[in-house]
Amino acid sequence: MSDESKPIEEPPIESKPQEEQDTEKESLTNSEESKKRAVEPSTDKKKKRRRRNYDEEDKELEKEEAKEKNAKTENNEEGDDDEDDEDDDYEQGKLEDEEEEEDELLEIDESNIITTGRRTRGKVIDFTKAAEELDKERGVVAEEDEEEEEEEEKENEDDDFKEQVQN
């Protein structure tokens, strides 16, 4: 019972199954048809595509819009009233927005608002003390600069005196 004694049967490579041949023919005919479609102008009117809405609210809105369109086609005079209604609705919405903004501002605690000075992370800074400290630091730096300048002047005077003596 060795593996070598059994011959392995392989299907012939040249023959293709019937299904593959059929799919190739279909793909050729499909590509030919697509070329024909591209060349021939379409006589059918393209439909306007609209996104589908599944919500009940959207259905209600569509019904209302349809009613409005029907009403506009029936009477042009009523269209003027519709415009007035739309203006009123717009103004009403504007007023509601302002009321909401005022309500939001009322919720803010006024004690947390910093009215003067710089914003710090909760730390209260006395700016007069800070200014004095800065002046002191600047004064110390200025004093050091003055001392260095005085030392340089003394060295320059010494150098000048030495030059005079040597001449």
Curated annotation (Swiss-Prot):
> What Pfam families does the database record attribute to this sequence?
CHZ (PF09649)
Acidic residues compositional bias, start-end: 76-110, 142-161
Say where the protein is mainly found: nucleus
Under the cellular component aspect of Gene Ontology, which terms does the record hold?
Answer: nucleus
Q: Compositional bias (Basic and acidic residues) spans?
A: 16-44, 60-75, 131-141
Query: What GO biological process terms does the UniProt entry carry, in alphabetical order?
Result: chromatin remodeling
**Cellular localization per UniProt:** Nucleus
The UniProt annotation puts the region (Disordered) at 1-116, 131-167
GO MF: histone binding
Q: Which InterPro entries match?
A: Histone_chaperone_domain_CHZ
Q: Which UniProt keywords apply?
A: Chaperone, Nucleus
Family the UniProt entry places it in? Belongs to the CHZ1 family.
Assembly, per entry: Forms a heterotrimer with H2A.Z-H2B, stabilizing the association of the histone dimer. Also, with a lower affinity, forms a heterotrimer with H2A-H2B.
Role of this protein:
Forms a chaperone-bound H2A.Z-H2B complex that acts as a source for SWR1 complex-dependent H2A to H2A.Z histone replacement in chromatin.
* Protein name as catalogued: Histone H2A.Z-specific chaperone CHZ1
